[in-house]
């Protein structure tokens, strides 16, 4: 016997929680062997949107303050920029959550 009665499903309360991916800081540390020019050139080469003036400001910050945050963004990109700068011989702090 087949029933023609309508079936109902219970109403569900669904909600989607969206979490943003955490950003990470790429931090260059001061050292005694990299020149101002080399640090500035590396920032220009690897950090997107970097200008010559900004690279020089950050290089001075590295020298006088001991460190500078040169880029903040998604982890995967931060890891790439960190690795590229380290490969060029810059002294890098570990990535930090922003």
Curated annotation (Swiss-Prot):
SUPFAM superfamilies: ClpS-like (SSF54736). It holds the Pfam family ClpS. One of its GO terms (biological process) is protein catabolic process. Gene3D superfamilies: 3.30.1390.10. Belongs to the ClpS family. Involved in the modulation of the specificity of the ClpAP-mediated ATP-dependent protein degradation. Binds to the N-terminal domain of the chaperone ClpA. This is ATP-dependent Clp protease adapter protein ClpS. It comes from Synechocystis sp. (strain ATCC 27184 / PCC 6803 / Kazusa). The lineage of its organism: Bacteria, Bacillati, Cyanobacteriota, Cyanophyceae, Synechococcales.
